């Protein structure tokens, strides 16, 4: 029997509707029986001379390896060949259809070289090693090595071990051609396919589609022709066109009955546009709404939309535009009669709508083609470089100007702040180095004498007329009340200036019997000066009044000198005695009363009289000088009375040190006159900022009766406190003076070690005697414990023991002013 392997006719009348395999009809073993009446024009276009296999799996297979070229009747295997492909890789590679389908899958995955290399190695091993084939074998070995092994980027080279590649390279270079030289590489590639590509092929869509349709579904033809038969390539889905490659088709164009010839081998934009209409419906009928993937890493793209690397329409309009135009309702309506002939029937419109939906599902979103980076405009360059540079320079200059303005403003604010804080009035090194003058606004809250001293500056005592200095100063202060105090480099005030300040400041005379003693009605300057003057008046009481006034003013000036050149001047005895002491609260109270004359001066200035700037007349000077002398004499009498009471300067200094840390004793009722006490309470706050300056003159002495009463009260308190403390604890507290860890007198420290813990617990318990019951209340964990407490004992050499205490009423022993115990759990 002559059996041809090509061009078997289709017997459409003998088709079966069942999917189960059937044996062939007797006498028709050589015929191909189709199980499906669908036309064969649904197949794919072949890539390299691949034909269409139209026979079914139920037809009698033609086996060239059998004696008759086919299997006899009754011996056909009931298992379809595509099911045997899933048994092993060799079963797949033994069948031509399986090889074709497997190669198609590998092409989609980009690893078809694995299968080609495997077949190349098999073919090289089958070459007989003879002299005639030696040259052919050498060329073939070199070709295999260069194409698959030498290229390090190829998939075969990547899947081959380096030792195997080195062995093949040595064989090729030394021309030691052996039939088994590629066996190791073939084994490695076969293992790779069995582990990766072969399982993926069995799960792929192309294999599942092939098995579902019983090998009758159209399939993409491979490079190698099937041994079962050949056919013509029909139009269908074109393969994916890569941007950097030119699509080629080596298949010869054969004409079919009733069919146009296949497209030419070269794919062009014009050809795609011409064949768009027939490709759209054919693709819909084949896929039935299913998507066919050409590669697992790439979205499906219909070649119709790939136009030389650029899209002709957006993705929304490119999705099956032919179907949209067919289903559009843009036809004109004929309203001549009752019929509407322009609208297609509802069934057709519904069918078109369903076709569009299926096409959208198949195509999906059409991705835009890749645009090379060189065609893209850089994002940074949006304007011309020259304009950009000008704008940048302009903005940078604006930023620089803003920063400079901010720096200047900060410098000005800093300068103003330093002026307000009295930076120019910083003291030189020495006793005045740690003190600063107050800021400018603070001068208005002080008595007139301090205001004059701060604003007039440090001037020479023998350089200018005191009256002119005073006039200039008053005018300047009234004109600019917030002026800056002069620095230390200026001149010190002279005696005339100080005397004039005292005269102008004390506008109210001291009337009444309390005024000469307490100085409440005198000006602030007199209050602060009399302690320097009265020590020298009683020695030379026969001197004239003018001389005493000049001497008093000179001594006051020497005590008020703030510059470094005045520290060598002679200081009065009382000043030297009181420089190391802080002024008492009573002194602050006496000095604070000086705000009354300043208020009167301010009222005069506001009313326009400007009395402080007027030079007093001769009669006024004489009257005020007389008042000053009267005040000096009264002060001398007061001091002599203090000395008779046996209160020396050392006691005063000690008492003042105590007074600085206690409440104001002058505020107590009964210490002074009730009205005076009220006035003093109102005038004490706020105190001067520089009242503790050691170079400032001391305030007048407080009432000695008040100081004696305060001293007696403190002594009584100390005696009461000493009687409460035991002698031993008082000695210990004196030894630990200054430490804040000493417990109060009515509490005791309790420390205990709980169940062998290395760190003790410490707490404070009220009372000196602590019982075991009180100690148990301190424990946070309740249970059965034994209690031991440390005490002094001579029984052992160590000198101490831990004594167990069991009774709750027992007093716990004390060790070094603490109760130290150990709590052990009873087993």
Curated annotation (Swiss-Prot):
Organism of this sequence: Rattus norvegicus (Rat)
Gene Ontology BP, a term: post-anal tail morphogenesis
Chain positions of motif Tankyrase-binding motif: 20-29
Region (Interaction with TP53): 209-338
Domain DIX positions: 745-827
Residue numbers bearing the Phosphoserine modification: 75, 77, 217, 468, 485, 492, 509, 578
Maturation and modification: Phosphorylation and dephosphorylation of AXIN1 regulates assembly and function of the beta-catenin complex. Phosphorylated by CK1 and GSK3B. Dephosphorylated by PPP1CA and PPP2CA. Phosphorylation by CK1 enhances binding of GSK3B to AXIN1. Also phosphorylated by CDK2 which regulates interaction with CTNBB1.
Domain of life per record: Eukaryota
Modified residues (Phosphothreonine): 480
Reported function: Component of the beta-catenin destruction complex required for regulating CTNNB1 levels through phosphorylation and ubiquitination, and modulating Wnt-signaling. Controls dorsoventral patterning via two opposing effects; down-regulates beta-catenin to inhibit the Wnt signaling pathway and ventralize embryos, but also dorsalizes embryos by activating a Wnt-independent JNK signaling pathway. Also facilitates the phosphorylation of APC by GSK3B. Facilitates the phosphorylation of TP53 by HIPK2 upon ultraviolet irradiation.
Cross-link (Glycyl lysine isopeptide (Lys-Gly) (interchain with G-Cter in SUMO)), chain numbering: 822, 825
Biased composition (Low complexity): 325-339
Region Interaction with GSK3B, annotated ranges: 348-432
Pfam family, one: RGS
Keyword Ubl conjugation among UniProt keywords: yes
Annotated spans, Disordered: 1-81, 215-287, 315-344, 530-625, 642-667, 713-742
InterPro entries: Axin-like (IPR043581), Axin_b-cat-bd (IPR014936), Axin_TNKS-bd (IPR032101), DIX (IPR001158), DIX_dom_sf (IPR038207), RGS (IPR016137), RGS_sf (IPR036305), RGS_subdom1/3 (IPR024066)
Protein's name in the database: Axin-1
């Amino acid at each position: 029997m002559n059996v041809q392997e090509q061009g078997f006719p289709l017997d459409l009348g003998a088709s079966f509707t069942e999917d189960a395999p059937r044996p062939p009809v007797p006498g028709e073993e050589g015929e191909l029986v189709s199980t499906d009446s669908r036309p064969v024009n649904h197949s794919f276009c072949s890539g390299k001379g691949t034909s269409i296999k139209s026979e079914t799996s139920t037809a009698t297979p033609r086996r060239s390896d059998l004696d008759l070229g086919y299997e006899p009747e009754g011996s056909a295997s009931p298992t379809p060949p595509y099911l045997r492909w899933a048994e092993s890789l060799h079963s797949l590679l033994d069948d031509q259809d399986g090889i074709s389908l497997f190669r198609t899958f590998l092409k989609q995955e980009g690893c078809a070289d694995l299968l080609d290399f495997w077949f190349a190695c098999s073919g090289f091993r089958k070459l007989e090693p003879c002299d005639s084939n030696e040259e052919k074998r050498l060329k073939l070995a070199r070709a295999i090595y260069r194409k698959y092994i030498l290229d390090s980027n190829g998939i075969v080279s990547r899947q081959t071990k380096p030792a195997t590649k080195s062995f093949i390279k040595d064989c090729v270079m030394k021309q030691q051609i052996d039939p088994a030289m590629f066996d190791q590489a073939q084994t490695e590639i076969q293992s790779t396919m069995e582990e990766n590509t072969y399982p993926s092929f069995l799960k792929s869509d192309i294999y599942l589609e092939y098995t579902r349709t019983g090998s009758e579904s159209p399939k993409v033809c491979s490079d190698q022709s099937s041994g079962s038969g050949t056919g013509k390539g029909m139009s269908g889905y074109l393969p994916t066109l890569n941007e950097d490659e030119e699509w080629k088709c080596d298949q010869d164009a054969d004409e079919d009955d009733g069919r146009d010839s296949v497209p030419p081998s070269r794919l062009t934009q014009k050809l795609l546009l011409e064949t768009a209409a027939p490709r759209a419906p054919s693709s819909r009928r084949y896929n039935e709404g299913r998507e066919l993937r050409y590669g697992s890493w790439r979205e499906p793209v219909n070649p119709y939309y790939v136009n030389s690397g650029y899209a002709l329409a957006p993705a929304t309009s490119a999705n099956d535009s032919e179907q949209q135009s067919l289903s559009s309702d843009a036809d004109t309506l004929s309203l001549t009669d009752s019929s509407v002939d322009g609208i297609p029937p509802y069934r057709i419109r519904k069918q078109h709508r369903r076709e569009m939906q299926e096409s959208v599902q198949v195509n999906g979103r059409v991705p835009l083609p890749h645009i090379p980076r060189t065609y893209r405009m850089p994002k940074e360059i949006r304007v011309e470089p020259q304009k950009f540079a000008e704008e940048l320079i302009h903005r940078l200059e604006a930023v620089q100007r803003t920063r400079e303005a901010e720096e200047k403003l900060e410098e000005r604010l800093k300068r103003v702040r330093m002026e307000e804080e009295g930076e120019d009035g910083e003291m030189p090194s020495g006793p005045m180095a740690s003190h600063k003058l107050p800021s400018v606004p603070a001068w208005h809250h002080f008595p007139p004498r301090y205001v004059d001293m701060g604003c007039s500056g440090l001037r020479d005592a023998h350089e200018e007329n005191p009256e002119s200095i005073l006039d200039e100063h008053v005018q300047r202060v009234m004109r600019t009340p917030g002026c800056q105090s002069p620095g230390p480099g200026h001149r010190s005030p002279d005696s005339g200036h100080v005397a004039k300040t005292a005269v102008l400041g004390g506008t109210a005379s001291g009337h009444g019997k309390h005024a000469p003693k307490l100085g409440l009605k005198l000006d602030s300057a007199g209050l602060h000066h009399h302690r320097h003057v009265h020590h020298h008046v009683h020695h030379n009481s026969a001197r004239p009044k003018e001389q005493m006034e000049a001497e008093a003013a000179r001594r006051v000036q020497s005590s008020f000198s703030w510059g470094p050149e005045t520290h060598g001047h002679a200081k009065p005895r009382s000043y030297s005695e009181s420089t190391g002491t802080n002024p008492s609260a009573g002194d602050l109270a006496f000095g604070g009363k000086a705000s009354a004359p300043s208020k009167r001066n301010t009222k005069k200035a506001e009313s326009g009289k400007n009395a402080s700037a007027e030079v007093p007349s001769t009669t006024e000077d004489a009257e005020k000088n007389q008042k000053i002398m009267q005040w000096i004499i009264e002060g001398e009498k007061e001091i002599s009375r203090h000395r008779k009471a046996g209160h020396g300067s050392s006691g005063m200094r000690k008492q003042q040190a105590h007074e600085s840390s206690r409440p104001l004793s002058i505020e107590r009722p009964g210490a002074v006159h009730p009205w005076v006490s009220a006035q003093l309470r109102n005038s004490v706050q706020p105190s001067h900022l520089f009242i503790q300056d050691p170079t400032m003159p001391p305030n007048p002495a407080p009432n000695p009766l008040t100081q004696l009463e305060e001293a007696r009260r403190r002594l009584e308190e100390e005696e009461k406190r000493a009687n409460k403390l035991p002698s031993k604890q008082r000695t210990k507290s004196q030894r630990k003076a200054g430490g804040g860890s000493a417990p109060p007198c009515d509490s005791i420290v309790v420390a205990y070690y709980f169940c062998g813990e290395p760190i003790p617990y410490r707490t404070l318990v009220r009372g000196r005697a602590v019982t075991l019951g009180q100690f148990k209340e301190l424990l946070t964990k309740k249970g059965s414990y034994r209690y031991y407490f440390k005490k002094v004992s001579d029984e052992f050499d160590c000198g101490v023991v831990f004594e167990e205490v069991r009774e709750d009423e027992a007093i716990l022993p004390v060790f070094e002013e603490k109760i130290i115990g150990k709590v052990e759990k009873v087993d």
